[in-house]
C-alpha cells in the first residue's frame, strides 16, 4: 500500500514538472529590464534551471523509448538493432580529445548545435506518430512535451550564451527540417525509423545534460570536473 501511494505521489510530481515551464525566457531579455516578462536571474540560477530542464528531458526520453519498445519493437528486433552499430550522428559537433582542452565556449555552442539539430526531427516525429492506429496517449503526450520543452531549452541556452559570452544567437526554425523526416515508404520502416530517432535523441539528450553539468562544474571551480 505504501509503495502504491509513493508511486502516485511521484507520478503527480512528474505531471507537475511536465506542465511547469522551467526555462524559456524571452529572447529579447536584457540585464537592465525589469518586470515579470524579463525576470532578473543570476547566472548560477539560470544554469541550474537549464540543467534541471535538461535532466527532465533526458528522463522523459528514456521513458518514451521504453514505451515505444514495449508497444512496437519485439525483443528480437531490438537485439538486431543493437548489434547493427551506432546509427546516430549529430552534425557539426567535433569530438575533443581531452576534457581539459574543451573551452566553455565550445561547450555552449556544441550544446546549442545538438539542441537545434533535434527541434525539427521531434516535430516530424509527432506527425508520423499521429498516424499510428494504436499509439498510447502517454507516448504521444511525452513526444509532444519533449518537442515543446526542447525549444524552451534552446531559448534558455541562448540566454546563457548571451550572459556568458556576450553573443546574440538566433533561435532555429523547426519547420525548415520537417520535410526530410515526415515521409516514410511504409509503416514498418516508419516505425523502425521513429524508434531509431527516439533512441538517438535519448543519447543526445544525455550528451546535452553532460555538457551543461561540466559547464556548471567549471563555474564552481571544482577539481572533480574530470569525472565528466
UniProtKB/Swiss-Prot annotation:
Cellular component terms (Gene Ontology): extracellular space
Xref: Pfam families: Hormone_1 (PF00103)
GO molecular function: growth hormone activity; growth hormone receptor binding
Coiled coil (residue ranges): none
Chain positions carrying an annotated carbohydrate: 141, 177
Biological process, per Gene Ontology: animal organ development; growth hormone receptor signaling pathway; positive regulation of growth; positive regulation of receptor signaling pathway via JAK-STAT; response to nutrient levels
InterPro entries assigned: 4_helix_cytokine-like_core, Somatotropin/Prolactin, Somatotropin_CS
Bridged cysteine pairs (disulfide): 29-38, 88-200, 217-225
Major localization listed first in the record, in broad terms: secreted
Domain of life: Eukaryota
Record family assignment: Belongs to the somatotropin/prolactin family.
Protein name, per record: Somatolactin
Subcellular location: Secreted
Keyword annotations of the record: Disulfide bond, Glycoprotein, Hormone, Secreted, Signal
Secretion signal, residue range per the UniProt entry: 1-24
Amino acid at each position: 500500500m505504501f509503495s502504491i501511494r509513493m508511486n502516485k505521489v511521484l507520478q503527480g510530481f512528474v505531471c507537475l514538472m511536465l506542465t511547469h515551464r522551467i526555462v524559456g525566457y524571452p529572447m529579447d531579455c536584457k540585464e537592465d529590464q525589469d518586470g515579470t516578462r524579463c525576470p532578473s536571474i543570476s547566472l548560477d540560477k539560470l544554469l541550474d534551471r537549464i540543467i534541471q530542464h535538461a535532466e527532465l528531458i533526458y528522463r522523459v526520453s528514456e521513458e518514451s523509448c521504453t514505451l515505444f519498445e514495449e508497444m512496437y519493437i519485439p525483443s528480437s528486433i531490438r537485439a538486431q538493432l543493437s548489434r547493427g552499430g551506432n546509427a546516430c550522428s549529430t552534425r557539426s559537433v567535433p569530438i575533443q580529445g581531452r576534457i581539459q582542452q574543451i573551452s566553455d565556449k565550445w561547450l555552449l555552442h556544441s550544446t546549442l548545435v545538438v539542441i537545434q539539430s533535434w527541434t525539427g526531427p521531434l516535430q516530424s516525429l509527432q506527425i508520423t506518430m499521429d498516424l499510428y492506429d494504436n499509439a498510447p496517449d502517454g507516448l504521444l503526450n511525452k513526444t509532444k512535451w519533449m518537442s515543446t520543452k526542447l525549444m524552451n531549452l534552446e531559448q534558455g541556452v541562448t540566454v546563457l550564451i548571451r550572459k556568458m559570452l556576450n553573443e546574440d544567437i538566433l533561435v532555429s526554425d523547426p519547420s525548415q527540417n520537417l520535410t526530410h523526416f515526415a515521409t516514410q515508404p511504409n509503416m514498418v520502416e516508419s516505425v523502425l525509423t521513429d524508434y531509431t530517432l527516439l533512441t538517438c535523441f535519448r543519447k543526445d539528450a544525455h550528451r546535452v545534460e553532460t555538457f551543461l553539468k561540466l559547464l556548471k562544474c567549471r563555474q564552481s571551480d571544482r577539481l572533480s570536473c574530470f569525472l565528466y
